[in-house]
């Protein structure tokens, strides 16, 4: 699982820099509607919806807006025919890239995704070409300052698979993706504040990127995330602190 924190940092950097709030809200609402349609409107029993609600709240979306999106998903309507589509390919430096999209038009989506790979020196692959390099996991992030021993005990008691301290003092906790909600609840009940919790694709191996290749991968991520239909971008690129300082 090495390298995921670098991916998370890249993702958080992008989210912090992205001033297009309207586009962010559109993507969040799509996910809320789709999650509710697929798994029902009860966030307590629908891990995907729970994660979507948490993301929406973290982005300062109002409860009313969230509830309306959930109601649309449960009740059906013109905007509930979205399908999850995952595209796989290779980015700069031979990095493996997975692009998770929500779309009602596959042709439109592929016309957005493919040029991003091409312009950044990568190429779109076939289904399964890089997916085997990732595991679907639940990811919980705890900010710096938590007591490691107490957090580890709480995480294990809640059913977590693994806990990894990060260089910045934060902690990443991994779970079976189906058990993300239960583990999260257990950790919260133990008194710890959750910074982020989501279902993610965790790379099993990573590719070290030098100062020349790293910016190319970051550009690819930015271009993909700017596509309207793209919800999440996962990759196995590893950017060291030394290289990051040069960017």
UniProtKB/Swiss-Prot annotation:
Domain of life: Bacteria
Entry-linked Gene3D superfamilies: 1.10.10.200, 3.30.70.980
A GO MF label: DNA binding
Lineage start: Bacteria, Pseudomonadati, Pseudomonadota, Gammaproteobacteria, Pasteurellales
Localization per Swiss-Prot or TrEMBL: Cytoplasm
Example of a GO biological process term: regulation of DNA-templated transcription
NCBIfam families (alphabetical): PRK00110.1, PRK12378.1, YebC/PmpR family DNA-binding transcriptional regulator
Organism of derivation: Actinobacillus succinogenes (strain ATCC 55618 / DSM 22257 / CCUG 43843 / 130Z)
Keywords linked to the UniProt accession: Cytoplasm, DNA-binding, Transcription, Transcription regulation
Chief localisation class: cytoplasm
One cellular-component annotation, GO: cytosol
Family, similarity comment: Belongs to the TACO1 family.
Protein name: Probable transcriptional regulatory protein Asuc_1803
